[in-house]
Amino acid sequence: MGTAKLVKTKASDLLYTRNDVADSDKKATIELLNRQVVNFIDLSLITKQAHWNMRGANFIGVHEMLDGFRTALTGHMDTIAERAVQLGGVALGTTQVINSKTPLKSYPLDIHSVQDHLKELADRYAIVANDVRKAISEAQDEDTADIFTAASRDLDKFLWFIESNIE
């Protein structure tokens, strides 16, 4: 097989793959996947911003907890982005795309207390958790729905941990 089949064609805007998911389902699912790529990249950066800049009671416990969250978010992000490519799409993860498409409001740079960070994080984790849960039923194939389900389980757990630390 030559490389001609591996480049984008105008006819479908999808990269060639032997995956038999219908092209229309692939396109809808790739859009959904890229929405979550944006969510997970932004949430992972916000998590690290809080991790670096918090001070006060329970610092070390929350600081270390957020490191674990960031690791898991990065794992889900990679799985989600790679699924978009597996379906013949392009994973959209540049800072320009994230900045223009994130549903998350800008994270405040002038807060320092653990409690203030936890409240800000809870709001943002809830947005992403709720959107991923919605994406499960919107996915056009079961494999993508499974990926979203795994991510949803972690996000719900992380939101619970964050909320449990808010005084």
Swiss-Prot record:
Q: Kindly list the positions annotated as binding Fe cation.
A: 51, 78, 82
Q: Name one GO molecular function term.
A: DNA binding
What's the Enzyme Commission number for this chain?
A: 1.16.-.-
Its recorded reaction(s) are:
2 Fe(2+) + H2O2 + 2 H(+) = 2 Fe(3+) + 2 H2O
Query: An example of a Gene Ontology BP annotation on this entry?
Result: chromosome condensation
Classify the source by domain of life: Bacteria
Kindly indicate where the leader peptide sits in this chain: none
Q: Where is this gene product found?
A: Cytoplasm
Does Ribonucleoprotein count among this protein's keywords?
Answer: no
GO CC terms on record?
cytoplasm
Has UniProt tagged this entry with the keyword Iron?
yes
Could you tell me the keywords of this UniProt record?
Cytoplasm, DNA condensation, DNA-binding, Iron, Iron storage, Metal-binding, Oxidoreductase
Family of this protein: Belongs to the Dps family.
Please give the function described in this protein's UniProt entry. During stationary phase, binds the chromosome non-specifically, forming a highly ordered and stable dps-DNA co-crystal within which chromosomal DNA is condensed and protected from diverse damages. It protects DNA from oxidative damage by sequestering intracellular Fe(2+) ion and storing it in the form of Fe(3+) oxyhydroxide mineral, which can be released after reduction. One hydrogen peroxide oxidizes two Fe(2+) ions, which prevents hydroxyl radical production by the Fenton reaction.
Q: How does it assemble?
A: Homododecamer. The 12 subunits form a hollow sphere into which the mineral iron core of up to 500 Fe(3+) can be deposited.
Protein name as catalogued: DNA protection during starvation protein
Q: Which organism is it from?
A: Cronobacter sakazakii (strain ATCC BAA-894) (Enterobacter sakazakii)
Its gene name is dps
